[in-house]
């Protein structure tokens, strides 16, 4: 199992590198920002090829929506993600929270880590500007 896991990591890193190389040939300046898979950040060659990372549910919602995650899990993920901020690359964190006070606490905490927070609903069917949903422009198009 350990060998398979190591091989899966190596294959995924090689896959992301191949995508990045091909995309940047076709479109110089193409950005590669994977979602989750922060365990791969331990590999310096992987960090070198990506331009940032997106991370969902860092503080809340791993097991139960809008409930705090296990502190050990948070620390482990933050340590990995900080490898990327140490390389001066952004970490975008998406938390699925509704309560304004929880959003504000999470925002302050994520910014202290040097991460860029974003808050929305899990269905991803609306955008938020700050702590409020963005206006619905569908009515404008009628």
Label each residue range with its predicted role:
Residues 1-142:
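Glycan-processing catalytic domains of CAZymes
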């Amino acid at each position: 199992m350990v060998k398979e896991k190591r091989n899966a990591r190596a294959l995924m890193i090689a896959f992301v590198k191949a995508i990045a190389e091909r995309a940047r040939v076709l479109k110089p300046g193409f950005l590669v920002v994977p979602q989750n898979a922060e365990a791969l950040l331990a590999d310096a060659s992987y960090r070198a090829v990506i331009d940032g990372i997106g991370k969902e549910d860092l503080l809340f919602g791993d097991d139960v929506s809008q409930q705090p995650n296990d502190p050990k899990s948070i620390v482990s993920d933050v340590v990995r993600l900080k490898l990327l901020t140490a390389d001066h690359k952004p970490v975008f964190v998406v938390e699925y929270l509704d309560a304004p006070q929880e959003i504000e606490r999470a925002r302050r905490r994520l910014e202290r880590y040097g991460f860029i927070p974003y808050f929305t609903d899990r269905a991803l069917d609306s955008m938020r500007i700050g702590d409020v949903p963005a206006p619905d422009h569908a009515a404008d198009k009628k």
